[in-house]
């Protein structure tokens, strides 16, 4: 989501979510290193945001920095705008080969790489992160997930359920507070 310092003491900046996480985390990692810290710095980025220029710059800098940083790529094959291009072809090759194909964009950039095929399986995630939590160099953890897993409506209509206000789980209809004006009422005024 969006970082907002008033919302969380762990958010240092106000920024949007698209393509910013890796570059932001690289700055935090550099700051940690300059002050002698050793905590894990973790960036989470979706495959839809991965194609942004700022994400590429962040990956490039992290590889050059060579320090402890975990980059989680949540690959749910979903973006509001359809994914196109070589990066997405490579992500598919990596998914299809269980992360083992010879052509690996992340390794080509100089980053270590781990693939988790069932990213909706909590135990698989715990095992993966247990293996790398003390790593002292940058690593990409490529996690293959199913958007909306476990809620049939979200699995079938990824775009509608990409982001939702509170809704009734049984009907999928938005919960509306009767005392508040809805969007249609406000725009009609």
Each model region followed by its residue ranges:
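Conserved thiamine diphosphate
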Residues: 2-5, 30-40, 85-128, 174-176
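Structural beta-sheet core signal
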Residues: 27, 43-44, 71-73, 143
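Alpha-helical scaffold elements adjacent to nucleotide-binding pockets in ATP/GTP-utilizing enzyme cores
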Residues: 57-61, 105, 127-131
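Short secondary-structure boundary/capping segments
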Residues: 57-61, 66, 84-91, 95, ...
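Terminal amphipathic helices with adjacent charged low-complexity linkers/tails
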Residues: 73, 80, 89, 120-181
């Amino acid at each position: 989501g969006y970082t907002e310092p008033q919302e969380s003491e762990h958010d240092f900046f106000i920024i949007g979510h698209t393509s910013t996480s890796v570059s932001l985390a690289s700055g935090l990692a550099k700051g940690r290193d300059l002050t002698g810290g050793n905590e894990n710095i973790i960036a989470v980025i979706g495959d839809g945001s991965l194609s942004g220029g700022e994400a590429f710059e962040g990956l490039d800098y992290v590889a050059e920095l060579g320090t402890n940083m975990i980059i989680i790529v949540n690959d749910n094959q979903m973006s509001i705008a359809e994914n196109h291009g070589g990066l997405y072809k490579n992500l598919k090759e990596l998914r299809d080969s269980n992360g083992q194909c010879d052509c690996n964009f992340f390794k080509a950039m100089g980053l270590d790489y781990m693939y988790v095929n069932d990213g909706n399986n909590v135990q698989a995630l715990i095992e993966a992160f247990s293996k790398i939590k003390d790593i002292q160099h940058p690593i990409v953890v490529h996690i293959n997930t199913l958007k909306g897993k476990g809620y049939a409506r979200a699995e079938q209509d990824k775009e509608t359920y990409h982001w939702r206000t509170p809704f009734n789980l049984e009907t999928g209809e938005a919960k509306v507070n009767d005392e508040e004006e809805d969007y249609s009422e406000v725009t009609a005024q």
